[in-house]
């Protein structure tokens, strides 16, 4: 962790700014520890201590947030962050077992917390999960906006107004129809966000360094992703081709596109409302916005 902080002092922004990323990494490491315990490749008492440590990070994230010290931008595709997580989990586990911080003969960041794993499978899986958790917040806010627009559509379903194309009078419509159209277009983008989340549910956990599962115990990839799905309640599945998935960034592009789509649609709705509320004396003033 410290070497990573010193070597990659680039943005001066720590990755602990995104709390869902810490939670997501803890879930991934917990799923891994559970799998390694079941497969008998990590001592049960060590695995249980690491599982306990992961639960601390999941349930008391703010308490340990300052322990994640690496820069957002770093070489090695996230190796510094992966080791940061391994070291935090190991030291919490060591304390839980009654040892002294840094006594890696009890719980080792490499040989225990990272057993059968690589930055190249744990880090992207954690990003996938954190993107789902964070986009859920966005979806909830968008749903509240959509519902508010639909409520106004019902309120104004009998209010006649002039419909326009290119700012020229066209044909009559109700103000309710206009509000419903805004709500519907927001709902379209909500569905696109949900569709993007489906791509994020395909992960490469257990692929290890390049997708060949080298260093992972037989059966580990399937068991680890099963654990992750059960722990989070999200239907995660491993890619059919772990080698392809290890270097693929398509899910991020799909999510980014969906977020941009929502932003563009919201901009359009905002501009419509701003124009219709223009005035108060010389503009359209068809809509009164609350002060």
Regions found by a protein language model. Name each.
Residues 1-291:
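Conserved, well-structured ligand/cofactor-binding cores
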